[in-house]
Amino acid sequence: TSDNLLAADIVTSDGELRRASVDENPDLYWALRGGGGNFGVVTSFDFQLHPMDRQVIGGEIYYPYEKAKEVISFYAEYCQDMPDDLYVDLVIFAPPFGLKSALYLDVCYSGHPKDAARVLEPLRRFVKPLKDEIRPVDYVALQKSSDDSDPRGTGQHLKSGFVKTISKALVDTLIENLESNMLRGSMAFFQQAGGAIREIATSATAFPHREISHNLTIGAVWPSGLDPEPHAAWADSYWNKVKGFTDGFYTNDAYGVDPVQVQTNYLTTLDRLVDVKSKYDPANLFRINSNIRPRPQA
């Protein structure tokens, strides 16, 4: 999203409404694209749009959970050569109440319809799917298809980090430690990166993680009214087993992250971000976030 930001109106810590764009306050514009909520309250965004047909080829394709390691390994390889107009997430979910675990790919292909069968054919060939729901679908409907997946009255505890390679060791760790539980759902999912994300220079925005292949998220969900502690503790334990395979994290997903890790996560952009923070929020008013600390005031 930040790569398509053309401009923003933002109220900074001094109460001023400012315009941030290539032509106005370009330092602030640069920082907003990856620096999170450190610089003020944004009241409007201007985004670059991209022409596309409303109808795409998309949906979910389910596989036997017993084939999870094989499916994830295939997915990792398949993602390396897929076209930019194909986006595929992988989801593993162990539901509560002893229900059967699920494994599926969430697909959106926005290329030419005549090429869809050829591009998607490997997903249907390498392992026989349990259910194939990939079909022509309205793009907006596809975007809204998961709106009810996080209903009110549900607690959740998530952790995430970037991966550059989905290694065999990571696959083994994910599957062998995903725990079924009568009272909670347990999950892991990969969100695809790469593609156009890698085409932008690291210094062009405040987002430095251009070489990642995926964002990996793990977590637990449970009905409200239950004690959250054991479920959150399980998610933390699961994360501790897989976090060694990650390298950095998405700023908006940061929760309960050590402040030192937050600083190092900005990599080569940190010094420039600190300069912008010190200019627009020298007292660190906007600090309930992945906080960039301003330089000490004289």
Predicted regions and their residues:
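Soluble FAD-dependent oxygen oxidases
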Residues: 1-298
